[in-house]
């Protein structure tokens, strides 16, 4: 009886190993080799449009939310801390620049690379707000920035 169980396990593992090469290419995602470009699916994003007639307090709240809820943790931390420090003191033109900066690019990594001066910033995003973000990113005060700030600072009753 004992040897039959061992034999069954050996046979099962051999069968799995022999089937693995036919199953893995379907399940495994990795190098595509020389696959032609049309097989890549690109989901089009709607183009960014400035919200005309939006009240400044509503815009600040929306930008705070959008600064905190990014597609990558690095930008969540960086932009939420930046928004905490600067958003309430920004002028209307600065808010428009910031809105365009965080919402128009389709790739969050681009924003991160521009803010950290890893890649050159396109002319359309160059401006006062980008300069403020780049300076903030340098972290000259050597603050520990490991997480997005709590929202307690927004509670005006405290």
Curated annotation (Swiss-Prot):
GO cellular component, one term: mitochondrial matrix
Presequence positions on this chain: 1-17
Gene3D superfamilies linked: Flavinator of succinate dehydrogenase (1.10.150.250)
Disulfide bonds, paired cysteine numbers: none
Keyword Membrane: no
Pfam families per UniProt: Sdh5
GO biological process: mitochondrial electron transport, succinate to ubiquinone; mitochondrial respiratory chain complex II assembly; protein-FAD linkage; tricarboxylic acid cycle
InterPro entries: SDH, SDH_sf, SDHAF2
Keyword Electron transport carried by entry: no
Keyword line: Chaperone, Mitochondrion, Transit peptide
Localization terms from the record: Mitochondrion matrix
Family: Belongs to the SDHAF2 family.
PANTHER family (alphabetical): PROTEIN EMI5 HOMOLOG, MITOCHONDRIAL (PTHR12469), SUCCINATE DEHYDROGENASE ASSEMBLY FACTOR 2, MITOCHONDRIAL (PTHR12469:SF2)
Record function comment: Plays an essential role in the assembly of succinate dehydrogenase (SDH), an enzyme complex (also referred to as respiratory complex II) that is a component of both the tricarboxylic acid (TCA) cycle and the mitochondrial electron transport chain, and which couples the oxidation of succinate to fumarate with the reduction of ubiquinone (coenzyme Q) to ubiquinol. Required for flavinylation (covalent attachment of FAD) of the flavoprotein subunit sdha of the SDH catalytic dimer.
Quaternary context: Interacts with sdha within the SDH catalytic dimer.
Name of the featured protein: Succinate dehydrogenase assembly factor 2, mitochondrial
Species this protein is from: Danio rerio
Encoding gene (name): sdhaf2
